């Protein structure tokens, strides 16, 4: 057997973030107050483990790159803001999403359909949506006697706005009276997007998928005839509030958005037959149909955080699950969980960041530091065998299929690794009912490389 040649991980050309920490736990050299050990909260919903706390999501993904956003490719950073509109209105210093009028109307229709399914009549639905989607002032809120602060735009931003086309007038509608205000009052802060404690809201999530579609109803709507807050809260049990409350976070309040709308106005001093000029403005409204993004953990990632690090508590129907129950539940959901987790635990303990290798036909992909910094170095196939290398294979290979998989891995600059988990011949299925069985497991790694005759001849000639 030839000796394996280890290649250095290939760093990505462009890196857009800094490396924080390999794991979401404090290390011995960290003595600052902010480095306290923290228990994160997750829920098991529809055979999936999801994290809903905003700070928990940031910590778990930012430190160790655990999980992925259910609406994003990797980091949970989903936003409904239109990138083209955000670039067009770049002079508006605001953290509120900017969307088109058509996109906002889609959300109004989704909210309308949701309330119809709850049994509301058409007049009640129309009344609720009319009141909820009225134009508002940008959400400056008084906090403990503080007056709202309006920070003007910088001169640089003003000059950039003046250079726009003459037919596009930048304005913002404020107040229910239809008044118009200039853009100098749109510099909002992140804490201005939630109303004060005096505004009660109901958040209802759709059970159809993990994408939390929510409709919010202000307290004033309870005074509308034939409509009560309980009507919008009939499905609260489908998405229990326990996770956000356990995590120490309150329910998200209203989400404010800026909608680009068009106005028609006659040009001053123009002839009657001159065409109308279209002016565009930004209108602040409440989003009637919110979409929440959560962090979804693989079963291996969730169990590693709970068992190996002890920093994750997983709840099912508001009840915390023990380590043994998690081991049994994950095995019932995914029959190959024991095998894949042992390999995941092994590679994580060695400093690699394992991710699902389904894209390249393997079980795991191994990254150095994390996907934002390096390309995956290895594609891993996992097999559980006894000490005689016998047993039922999870994935039997023929020479043809193995050569094809090796060719695929080589074409994407990854090495194919066979990871053999060797258990004693005396170990029974009953012995594997708890994670303590991992103490008796040995691991052997085999790197598979393709022999190329022409390359071998050139190497021999050089020698």
Curated annotation (Swiss-Prot):
Chain intervals for the UniProt region annotation (Disordered): 120-213
Keywords, comma-separated and alphabetical: Lyase, mRNA processing, Nucleus, Phosphoprotein, tRNA processing
Reactions this protein catalyses: pretRNA = a 3'-half-tRNA molecule with a 5'-OH end + a 5'-half-tRNA molecule with a 2',3'-cyclic phosphate end + an intron with a 2',3'-cyclic phosphate and a 5'-hydroxyl terminus
Localization, UniProt: Nucleus; Nucleus, Nucleolus
CDD domains associated with the record: tRNA-intron_lyase_C
Active site: 367, 375, 414
Pfam (any one): tRNA_int_endo_N
Sites of Phosphoserine modification: 32, 147, 406, 409, 413
Comp. bias (Basic and acidic residues): 139-149, 159-170
Role noted for this protein: Constitutes one of the two catalytic subunit of the tRNA-splicing endonuclease complex, a complex responsible for identification and cleavage of the splice sites in pre-tRNA. It cleaves pre-tRNA at the 5'- and 3'-splice sites to release the intron. The products are an intron and two tRNA half-molecules bearing 2',3'-cyclic phosphate and 5'-OH termini. There are no conserved sequences at the splice sites, but the intron is invariably located at the same site in the gene, placing the splice sites an invariant distance from the constant structural features of the tRNA body.
Subunit structure as annotated in this protein's UniProt entry: tRNA splicing endonuclease is a heterotetramer composed of TSEN2, TSEN15, TSEN34/LENG5 and TSEN54. tRNA splicing endonuclease complex also contains proteins of the pre-mRNA 3'-end processing machinery such as CLP1, CPSF1, CPSF4 and CSTF2.
Protein name: tRNA-splicing endonuclease subunit Sen2
């Amino acid at each position: 057997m030839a000796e394996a040649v280890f290649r250095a991980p290939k760093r990505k050309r462009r890196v857009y973030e800094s490396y924080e920490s390999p794991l979401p736990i404090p290390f011995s050299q960290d003595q600052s107050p902010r480095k306290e050990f923290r228990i994160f909260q997750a829920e098991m919903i529809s055979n999936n483990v999801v994290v809903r706390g905003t700070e928990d999501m940031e910590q778990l993904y930012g430190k160790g790159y655990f999980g992925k956003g259910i609406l994003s490719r990797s980091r949970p950073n989903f936003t409904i803001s239109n990138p083209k509109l955000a670039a067009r209105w770049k002079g508006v210093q605001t953290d509120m999403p900017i969307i088109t009028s058509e996109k906002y109307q889609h959300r109004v229709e989704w909210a309308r359909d949701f309330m119809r399914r709850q049994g509301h009549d058409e007049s009640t639905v129309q009344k609720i949506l009319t009141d909820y989607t009225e134009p508002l002032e940008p959400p400056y809120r008084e906090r403990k006697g503080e007056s709202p602060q309006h920070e003007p735009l910088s001169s640089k931003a003003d000059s950039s706005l003046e250079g726009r086309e003459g037919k596009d007038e930048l304005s913002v509608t404020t107040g229910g009276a239809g008044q118009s205000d200039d853009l100098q009052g749109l510099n909002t802060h992140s804490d201005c997007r939630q109303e004060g404690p005096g505004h009660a809201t109901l958040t209802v999530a759709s059970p159809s998928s993990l994408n939390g579609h929510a409709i919010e109803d202000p307290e004033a709507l309870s005074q509308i005839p034939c409509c009560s807050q309980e009507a919008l809260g009939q499905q609260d049990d489908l998405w229990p509030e326990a996770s956000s409350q356990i995590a120490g976070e309150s329910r998200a309040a209203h989400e404010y958005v800026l909608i680009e709308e068009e106005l028609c106005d006659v040009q001053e001093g123009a002839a009657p037959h001159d065409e109308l000029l279209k002016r565009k403005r930004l209108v602040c409204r409440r989003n009637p149909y919110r979409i929440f993004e959560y962090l979804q953990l693989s079963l291996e990632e969730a169990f590693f955080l709970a068992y190996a690090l002890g920093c994750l508590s997983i709840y099912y129907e508001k009840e915390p699950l023990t380590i043994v129950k998690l081991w049994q539940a994950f095995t019932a959901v995914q029959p190959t969980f024991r095998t894949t987790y042992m390999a995941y635990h092994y590679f994580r303990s060695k400093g690699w960041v394992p991710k699902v290798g389904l894209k390249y036909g393997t079980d795991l992909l191994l990254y150095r530091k994390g996907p934002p910094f390096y390309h995956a170095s290895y594609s891993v196939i996992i097999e559980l065998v006894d000490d005689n290398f016998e047993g039922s294979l999870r994935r039997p290979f023929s020479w043809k299929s193995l050569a094809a998989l090796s060719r695929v891995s080589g074409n994407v600059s990854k090495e194919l690794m066979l990871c053999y988990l060797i258990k004693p011949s005396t170990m029974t299925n009953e012995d594997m009912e708890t994670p303590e069985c991992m103490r008796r497991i040995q691991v052997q790694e085999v790197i598979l490389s393709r022999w190329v005759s022409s390359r071998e001849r050139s190497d021999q000639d050089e020698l």
